[in-house]
Structure formats: structure tokens, C-alpha cells
Amino acid sequence: MSENWYALTPDDVAAKVDVDPAAGLPAAKAAERLAANGPNALAAEKPAPGWQRFLAQYKSYMQIILVAAAIASLAIGQITTGVAVLLITALNALGGLRQQGKAESAMNALQSMLKTSARVRRDGTEVKIDADQVVVGDVVLLSAGDDVCADGRIIEATSLQIDESALTGESVPASKSVAVVTDVNPVLGDQSNMAFMNTPVTHGSGVMIVTGTGADTAVGGISGMLKSAPTTKTPLTRQLDTLTLWIAGAAGLTIAIMFALGISRGDSTQAIFTTAIALALAAVPMAMPTVLQVILSSGARDLAAHGAVVKSLDSVETLGSTSAINSDKTGTLTMNQVTVVEVIDPSDRYTITGIGYGLDGEVQHTAGSTNTIEAAILPFLVANDAKLVNGKVVGDPTEGALLVLGHKAKINIEGTQDSLPRVATLSFDPTYKLMAVFCEAKDAAGAPVIRAFVKGAAPAVIGRATSALAKGASVPWDDDLSTRADAQMTRLGGQGLRIMAAATVDISPDGFDPTGDLLALVQGLQVTAIVGMIDPPRPESLDAVRSAQEANIRVRMVTGDDVVTGAAVAKQLGIEGEAILGTDFAALSEAERLERIDGIGVVGRVAPEHKVLMVETLRKKGAVVAMTGDGVNDAPAIKAADIGIAMGTGTQVAKNAGRMILTDDNFATIVRAVSEGRKLYDNMLKYIRFMLVALVTYVVTFLLASVLNIAGGQPFTAREILWINFVITAPVGIALGLDKETPGLMSRLPRLRSASIMSPAVITTVGLVGLFMAVAINVLIVFGENQYDTLGVASTMGLVAFSMMLIIAAFECRDEKASILRVETFDNRTLNITAVIEVALAVLIATGAFLPDLLGTVTLTSGQWLIGASPALVLFVGWEIGKLIARRRSGHVAAP
């Protein structure tokens, strides 16, 4: 049933859903509706069984090729090789499954948040029922401490306030009333006569008629968006999939050539299959998943130490490509601690230093001559039910901010409150927008009075005023004073400040009835002051936003607050761009959104669908988008973003939808995480360049050996290939992945979503280096066989050559253009140690006892070993010459 319930009167709503609010639904009618529409619950997301998720890990091209190679190995009797390869695929699958298992369903977390019971009227009596039995038309009773069980139209409200922060992002509880909302298509935060499922009642009481249950609620709509939000692969993952396919294709073509040549030469089928299996193993980067997981795990540990916990390792990689951050305002860019920054009365003006709930600020008297601020702010302190406990506010955050003001003014708040015994309270209500407490006091002559201390929205308080307090004396509230007050409020409002006013009025004790019409007594007020307050930016947010901008990352503020407040905070933080309402952004055509998005810096009063729309628009523009949030309303956009970031203090729904959790809720941590992500992405590219050199060398080496019939077409055995992959390239790759950050990394442009890891320069380098290494290996094998008349010596020399050239390649791959003949080349201690170990192993495979038996190599003389290692020196010289040419062409300056 889709209706604009907020636009209907309570009587119209009751008629629409066919219920008598006084009696509630008849039990029989409720049962009919329950049977027709189903329970008031959200559909749970059923996870796939563990075995299905395990088998799903075998859908990647690499896993398929490895399984095929293992089966072929077993078929021709190479049991050890086949079993080893199957174990490798199982380890890869378990690694992927382990990461997948950490991501709990956001939908199921949403389901678990729903309340379990509700108080309703049925057949004229109040009954308590399970929340999933609530139906449209039920009359639900609400009181402080309850969670709203469904969406409903409020028909009675007594000082009713509901915390809707999880749905709207607004940190202050929403005041509710029964009045019709006349706005057109208001966002949830502006529907003041509606209550929404799963929001807690914080104050007062009320009655509502249920208008939506289950999937037809605001929370249900969010659940639907979560269900429809696609799970996206990271940019690097997509490119590696494509790269693996290309390499597999090249290997497949080489294998076909090998088969054709082998058959034409009369080679045995088993020999041909053995060679084909060896090439298949060589052409697949089987160690890559392990190496990448080690690299990303290291980054994840570093991030966790700085307050950012990643749930999936590929999120670290995505951070490195982030080009746009859509950030929530409250608590992320700001402190989520309302702070009074200015106090104004008719004769004086004060600015207040310090931020948040800390008491270390002070009151600075910037205009006027009154000796003390106490009389001006006293109503804010007396008409106040909050408490400050260990730097935290217990109660309403706005009242807490006013208490902090009192402490900064050196006022004994508790003593002042005790000296003015409270006899009655008029609670805040959105219809009159103020609060008043009535206390026993004495007037200037010492006569007893009932003094009302009033605080509330400035227009509401001033509208009941006849005078003001100026320099300790009462002055009439005339046109001049009204004009001055309006000017000050306009100034404060333009700065995004929330404005409140305070006042007093003395009432005769005679005939005062604390249970009577207290609102009628709040007349003829004497205004004492107006205050401006704001949730201030975090001290570190300004530098963090600047750092993001210097890294060419566009920061946008997405907030549930109004546009003026958002724009004011954005200006303080240096966030550029126009401020626009979420509804206005959604009303644009897709072409207009794509055209205007670059100029937008703040989006206010956003609904969940607006946030998703922003993410989708930016992604269509080619941006890699990070989205932060903490509420249920943020979860769909968090899930839709390339990197969803949830606040540690946020809802479990948001945390489950996100890929990263900020334990300190701090925007600066996001920028630090992006820096770490860029470093790891850059290091992974170093590893990928190194890995590609090895893969191209493999394929070309086998191709040349087959065409020229060198070493029987099989330059390396399967055991030697596994050795190279897991004992040489894997440790070296990990060392590259743990490299230090390249200077100037954060000043680079973010990597475009469409940018290829295979740039023309990389293709040229990898192709030339791989070709040289392949030719060198085959030449050495031919030379060794002719010179020493034994294939064993020749093949071992080829393996030594490959090993030593890979060590040179590791150092050269650290930078595409910079020479390795500089001090910085050896600042990676892990790589230095790894290189020394690899050189030692290259010696042992040709001189020791155990490794030659394991690999099938033979013992070399020192002269033979040096000949085998000599191509590494030639490779070094050639690579350095190539880098020198590249530097001169690009004007790149580097140490020689």
C-alpha cells in the first residue's frame, strides 16, 4: 500500500487502513491481514553452503589451467607433480574462502536488529505481541525505551522524540508531532509525523497507526537496495584475470606448436605431454595468489595499527586507486560533539574557545562591558536535564553543549541548580519548540516568585518576549532590538550555526498550579541571550582533506543535515563545490548528473537512494569511489561503492556492508589508508612486472626449445618450474611487495579505473627482457651440451642463468626508469636478504648434494657456474642502458 501518509490527517489514515484508533484492529481482521501480507519481517539472505563456496574458487582461469595440468600429470604417471599442483589449487581456494568468510551479510545484520515485541490495541484492549505479527492498521503504543516495530503515522504525541540517526544521519533525536506535513516529497528526516521501523524512542510517548510492515518499510527499502547492490571486482583483479587469460592463450598456442613439431619429429606421446605439462605449469602464475595475499595481509596489519580494519584483502588494493571520497559529515569530518561558539545579548558579545565536550576552553568577551556572562546563559543551565560524566554527555547532546558552556564560564552549575528548586517542567515539544522549568526563586526585592527558565528555538522564544536583559537591566523588546537580533541570527545561520535563545519570566506563587497549563505561563518573556552552536570539524580533518586534495582525490560531503550547515562545515574544511539537496540531485537527468557532478561538493538532506545514485554517477564518470557512513541508511551506498567504509561506532548493518571499518571514526584515517593502499598497489605492480618477466621468459624459452629442438623441447622439468615459482619468484615477489613507499607517491594522479597495468613501457620492457632471457637460456643449453657433451650440465647451467637473471630483474623492477646504481636501491632490507639467499641457493642447486637430488640437476665446476651466471651481468648492462634512454626521452631525472 503506497501512500503519502505524512500528508494525511490521523482520521484519514485511520479510514484508509480501516481501523478505529481507540479500539485497534479486531483479532480476526489482524489474522486475515497477516495471512494475506505475511509477517512483519525482512527476508534473510541464505549463504551458500561451504562446499559450494569452496568449489566457486575454482572458477578462475588460473585454477582451471592448474587442475587440467594436474589431471594430465596424473594421467601420464607423474604422480608427485600432479598431487603437488592439486595441493596448490586447494591452498589457493582455501585462501579465497577464508577472505570470503569474513564478510557477513548486511541483510542478515539488518534482520537481527529488528525488535521482537510490540504493544498494540486489539479488540479494545492493550496486548503485547511478537513484532513479526504486527500488520498494517495496528494501533501501536510507543514510550521511551521502545524500538518502533514498523512504519506508522503518529496520531498522538507527548514530547515524543525518536532517534532516527541510523536512517537519516542526524545525530539529534527527531521531535515528533501529529501535524500534517505539507512539504512535497520530504525526505525521512522531514517527515515529523511518521515513525519508522527499528528506530528507538528516546523521550516522551505516542501512538501510531501502522502503515507499512516488512519489505514495505523504510528499512525494508534499504534491505532491497542491499540485495540489489552488485558485488564488484577490484580494478586490479579484473586486469589480472584478463592477463592470465592472455598468458594462457599464448601458452596454449605454444603447446599446439610443440605438439605439431613433436609429432612431426616422431617424439613419443608421453614426452610431448610431459613437455606440455611443464609449460602449462610455467605459464601460470601459480604463486601469485599466495604472494598477493602476503603483500595485502602486511598492508592490512599496518592499516589496523592505524585504526582501519579491512575485511577483504583486495580492499587494500582498491584504496590505492581511490579517486573520490563521499564522506559522511557527523562524527567523521566533525567531532559529533555540539559546541557553543558564540553568545550574544543586547549589550555584549562573547566568543567561546575550545571544541567538543572538553572543558579547557574559555569565554572571551569580544564586545560590551557587562562584568559577567552568568545572567545571560543561566536559563540554558537551569532548564537542562543533561549530565557531564568523564567527558561524555549523558542526555541530550545539545543540553550537554550548554553545560560545557557553563563550565567554561566558571559557573557552579550543580550549586546553581540546587539553589533554584524545580517545581514543574514543561517538556520540549515540536509544536511550540521550547522547554521551560519552573523554580522557586526571589525577585530583586527578595520576595518569593516562581521563575520560569526558558530555552528553545530562537524564533519561538523571541516570539513570546516583551523585554530583554541588557547590562543587568530590563529593556523593552522594541523594533530596533528585534532588527538587531534578526541581523545576528541571519549572520549566525549563514555560518551554519544552530541558534537557540534563552529567557526568564517571574510568576506569582499565588495560584501557581504545577499540573496546570504551563505553556500559557510562558509569556512576557525577558530574553537573556542567543547562542550559536555547531558540531565542529575534527582538528585533524582540515589537514586530512588537504592531503586528499594534494593526492588528487576529490572529497565530497554527503550529509543528512541541511545544505546550509553542510556548506558551512565544508567551507571550514576546504571542500570545494556547490551545495545541493539530495532530492534536487536525484531530480536531474542522468546526463545532467554526469555533467554537474564534478562541480558538486556538498549534498544535504540525503536519502539512501541519493547516496547510491551519487556512487553510481561517479563510477560512470570513471572514478574509483570510497563511501563512508555509519547508519542503516548508509549501507546500500557503502555496499555499492568500490570501497565501502563503515564507522566503528556505526550500526552492524553498515559494518557488514562495508569492506573497511574505521575504529576511530576519523576521516584522517581514510587518507592514511589511501596512502597505504597506493604504496601497496605500487608494490604489487613491481611484483607483477617481475612476474611477467618470468612468465614471458618461460613461454619464449619453451617455444624456442621446441622449434629448435633444444633439450628435447623441454628446457626445464616440472620440478624445476615449481622450484623457480615457489623458491625464487615467490619470496622475491613478497620482498618487492613489502618495499618502502616510492617518494612522491601521494602527489600522483589516482590510477584510472580503465588504466591498464600493461602500459606500452611495461610491454616493451617485459617483452625485450623476456626475449633476451629466453635466448640466453637456450644459447647456454646449446653451448653446455656442445662444450661438455652432457645435457645435464647444460640444463643446470640454464637453471643457474634463469635464477641469477631473476635476481637482477627483481632490483630493476623496483622502478621503471630509475637506475639501480644508487644508494636507494638497497634500502629494502627484505629484498637484500632474499637476494643473498637466492644467490646461495643458485650455488647449492649446482654444487650441493640434497638440492641436485631433489631437482635432478648435476654438479657444476666453478667455471661452469660462472658461465651460467654470466647472462645476468649482460642483462644488467642492457637494462640500465634501456632505462637511461627512457629517462632522457622523458626528461626523468634520477641518480646515475
Place the predicted regions along the sequence by residue:
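Soluble-to-membrane junctions at the N-terminal ends of transmembrane alpha-helices
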Residues: 40-71, 104, 126-127, 185-194, ...
